[in-house]
């Protein structure tokens, strides 16, 4: 009891309403909840905790593995006698869908999207509310996005992301995006929220796709990586059907939330059987702004990767980024996604994708070299990740080099060994060199 040594300070603290009380007061004040509903929610939550405690005691659990939700349905001894009389194990305890140990995707689902959905998203960017006047540059951007959706222009990184969000929303999957300057994006490529040039009012095109679409939230967060990532991790657990995304202003800044990453993102499943599909977008690239604005510290996340605890990706094309986001929304079992996103590629014409890559195909963990016409003539294979590919390809073209193939490793963990082996097998006469980012 700290009041024994600091009575005055803790007397003051005791008079301050708790965080929960302040939060409830805010919800009630905004009309989002009544006081009775708040009390009922608290009572239900506490009752659930009590039930789980009694269930654990009755089962005689003594280790994390014994109380892991993923193992309970496979071990009748742990559930026998826990529920009410006459109930079977399946009736007495229902595992939340978000914590199911199954693998794979939703049956019949693919990450490709129909062209008509893409066109709808494009049109939504040019149908402004009456009297709404966007900045002239943003009007031009929205018109380009419509042309991209119609297949008349290659699709860039910013619009590929909005296409992923929009198609998910139309399918009924909510999307939450938070971070510093995420509405516009640090590198000014997203513009998920548009502003009237005269009065500043906001318009979010992805909220006006269909009448019954899911919820799309975009929040410019406070400058606290620790607090915001912790909140979003919890949000991903409480709203598992939502694609919850946290974006660092620069990937380097995630070190301010390292405790959350260590204690929850990379290890909660192993410790508590707690599954999350949280997405961390970490801008990475040495074309940044010097120290602490260049490296998302890829090596740090690879050191934390083990026992299939995360999905670590560095996509190099808008289309693969699109498929990555849509795959994450439905991938089972749920795993956190660490995605290293580019800077230069956001506006690099060579990195744009054709609309056909969005209406067909899937996420590619490895991208082979489609420019090679004679694999037997290749004497060297360069294996790389991310934007580095475009630098290498440009230099190869400058030299007129036809003996070097470049393979992109898009998925860093789990390492796609079979796909890497298949890509390398095409070049039996070549040595392999890893090109470090």
Give the residues covered by each predicted segment.
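Flexible, glycine-rich loop/tail regions that form catalytic "lids" or insertion modules at the edges
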Residues: 1-436
